[in-house]
């Protein structure tokens, strides 16, 4: 049976626990499997279905400074080190495809003995709970930083108030009979009004979003800076954003020069310039097929399919009955969204009916799930409260910073006039 083509590969090393040694080779990610092959003999040292992965983490050990670990069902942990271009890039790509695999509504059951539905849910919720706890710690630390920044701005405001009083003393000495010195003008009032008008300037029109998908974003040629983000297709533009929503670049429809499709999960978008470097972003996404159909309609003359894409289409065509190829998210090529009906023999129909009627979650698992969901709900509510508080703190910081900047500029102009 032919091996699935790789979506992405990384040179690195794998720890063979039975031999207590590290082996160099290549880590490869395919549509359904994570593999590691040795560099010398080209033999597979590890092959793991994405559906069996429970957790992906970045860790450190006494043997190697930094490593990437993959926890398999059965509490079996795989260690990867010396990953190039960097560990963070590999982590972001693996986590993205693994998460999309978990969230896929058409996730198939593997050929090996699978866990029950209740155990799968417990495993998924426990992972989400751990991540939410880590997020809560980060949010608390971030909130403390915001509080320190607000205290610092309050101190700056008090210092500016003292500076204003001292400048007023210098501008209007007690021996001067008038309220203002003759060299003062109305320029300050005009500049302040202009600054306020700039702050209250309205934003532009909001375009309609056609489709938005999560993706791994990086500049073409800089694979070491892979980070999670998103690709948003609008009516007249394309937006590439970071995971926090910050806009990296907006390609207007007429500015896009070419879109290369490397495989069903990876594309590049380029805007060419004369006399300066081109702007080119490369995007990896497990849901890229959702965007490809729109891109082919909007940019049909600019979309170019590479030869690597044909490998994925031919592989999927030769293995239509693969148990791991289900759903449009994991279809290897465009146009495989339709499911082929399977004929069931009459003798096996009763067995299928009995299998459907069997309970998928036991009462004990349901009780455990209920408790875990309650804990997850409490953590989410605490995180939401902290986020709302930090949103208010950010508004205060923004207003205080603008006010302090305006006062500093005004005091600077006043001091220059006094010199």
From Swiss-Prot:
Keyword field: Coiled coil, Repeat
CDD domains: SNARE_SNAP47C, SNARE_SNAP47N
Coiled coil found in the keyword field: yes
PROSITE patterns associated with the record: T_SNARE
Presence of the UniProt keyword Protein biosynthesis in the record: no
InterPro entries associated with the record: PH-like_dom_sf, T_SNARE_dom
TM region positions: none
Descriptive protein name: Synaptosomal-associated protein 47
Lineage: Eukaryota, Metazoa, Chordata, Craniata, Vertebrata
